[in-house]
Amino acid sequence: MSTLLKLTPSIPDWLSLEIANRMMEKLTIIKLQAEHIFHSGSVQLGLMHKRFPKARHYCSNAKLEHSSIQRLLLQLLRRPSVQFHSTDALRPQHLMDLVWSNLELQHHDQPELLVQSWERLLKPESLLMFAYLGPDTGKELRVIDGASEPIAGAWDMHDVGDALLKSGFAEPVMDMEYITLEYEHPDLLLKDAIELGLVVEKGSDLIKANHELAPLKMTLEVVYGHAWTPERRLSKSHDGVAKIAVDQILRSK
């Protein structure tokens, strides 16, 4: 029997920080002044604070929110804090200058809904920047029948580009890279695979029993993307029907 008690997907801290640094390198070539930043997924306040020292930070995970006393103390220390912000579609949105999503999309069974929530958060002419794990992640584990499966929301990057356009984003740019992790022991590989949500129920026992079938390495397909919200949200397509927001209708002069 496996001694692992849960197979809940998460992201190892070392991986989220590594990908955040790679995203930040891509952000350096983009001209952006951000006062309000929403974190979707892993939160790296220190890293973002270096680029946007005056920005306020928000996230949808209430567990990560700093209390009012903590925020006051951090303000006195000139360090960033994070506040909770709902992504509820019924609440007023379009408040953010930047949505930063580090390794979140692949955790969603319906990733298109997450893309739509990002669009609701952003002001006109604001930036979405994200990274997620693509469908080739953990492909080495699939040689062991019944032990692993692709991550639920590991979309092909072209499908994500289409979802961005359908949700009202403009100028989407997508690229990807492969990162190969090598391990000295099967247990170390298994630990990371479980954290990433690659191992199905009872899969850990199968991998341990048949580890000689799979190499001691794991591929991460990391997909990066960014897109802008247009100056005016003129229309959106839903089920083949274009809708025009009332506040976007211009009177002819």
Segments from the language model and where they lie:
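A short SAM/SAH-binding and catalytic strip from SAM-dependent methyltransferases
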Residues: 96-112, 116, 132
